Amino acid sequence: MRRLFATAWTIWLIDFVTKAWALQSLNANPRKIIGTFLQFTLVHNSGAAFSFATGFTIAFSLLALAVVIATIYFAPKITSMGWQVAIGLLLGGVLGNLTDRIFRTPGFLSGHVIDWIQLPNWPVFNIADSAICIAAAIAFTLSMRNVPPITRVR
């Protein structure tokens, strides 16, 4: 359980710090890091990950709260190291974007998420979005390998 929460806290902290940096450094100045392949561009996103479904900010906020509550409830039961990392990445990513939705304008549960990483032909995203996607990939891999999240002790 400690691994799950350490992973979540680390992702949340990295996401928080990088968003603060993006707000400070990228306001009117997008930066080309690797030509047009990788750019840092500040975007205020009212939708879900990768700017999907804008206009449903409150619904996504409530869903994120449900994910956080469920994760905290089930966390003590997860014994697999791989699943702890996957769920920790998910929790950290969800908390990162939920922090924006709670504390950023236009207001409580409807705040815009700060996105800043841009690749060609792909929506602008952030560290939290990346963590959620990596969590999904790990969970998919663990599921395909039939790795249970909970090892039953007999």
Predicted regions and their residues:
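Alpha-helical transmembrane bundles and membrane-interface segments of multipass inner-membrane proteins
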Residues: M1-R154
